[in-house]
């Protein structure tokens, strides 16, 4: 991608320079699931935002075996249902990019009636303030962990 030189991009894609692989795990882990780490942050773009980060390095969905792809989708299905129930979101949006960090990860954006981006996609460059009030994120995190441990 334009941010990276060709050499840097190849090293990122191979996992050699992947910041997630180099640190061993992604930042903000809420839970470890079958194929992914579930992450979130109090500085998320939307209340209830989560990200599923593949445990092993892969860049594209086609890099996964059929079994890995099924496990990834099961993690996504499980988390998305729980996030929707916890947040009361009217819709969940799912995004896969990888042009900034080429390590397969899936963003989950709960959507709400009257949210700042109700008529379009979420612009994360505009949403810089935490969507959580005092202790709300920690409550969301604990509730999410508790619900995941029930299954």
Residue ranges and their predicted role:
Residues 1-151:
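HIT superfamily nucleotide-processing domains
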């Amino acid at each position: 991608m334009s941010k990276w030189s060709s050499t840097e991009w190849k090293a990122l894609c191979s996992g050699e320079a992947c910041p997630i692989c180099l640190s061993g795990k992604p930042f903000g882990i809420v839970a470890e699931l079958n194929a992914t780490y579930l992450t979130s942050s109090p500085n998320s773009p939307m209340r209830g935002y989560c990200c599923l980060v593949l445990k092993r390095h892969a860049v594209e969905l086609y890099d996964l075996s059929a079994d890995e792809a099924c496990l990834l989708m099961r993690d996504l299905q499980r988390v998305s249902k729980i996030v929707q129930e916890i947040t009361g979101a009217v819709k969940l949006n799912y995004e896969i990019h990888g042009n900034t960090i080429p390590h397969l990860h899936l963003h989950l954006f709960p959507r709400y009636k009257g949210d700042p981006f109700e008529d379009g996609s979420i612009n994360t460059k505009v949403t810089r303030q935490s969507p959580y009030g005092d202790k709300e994120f920690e409550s969301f995190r604990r509730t999410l962990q508790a619900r995941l441990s029930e299954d």
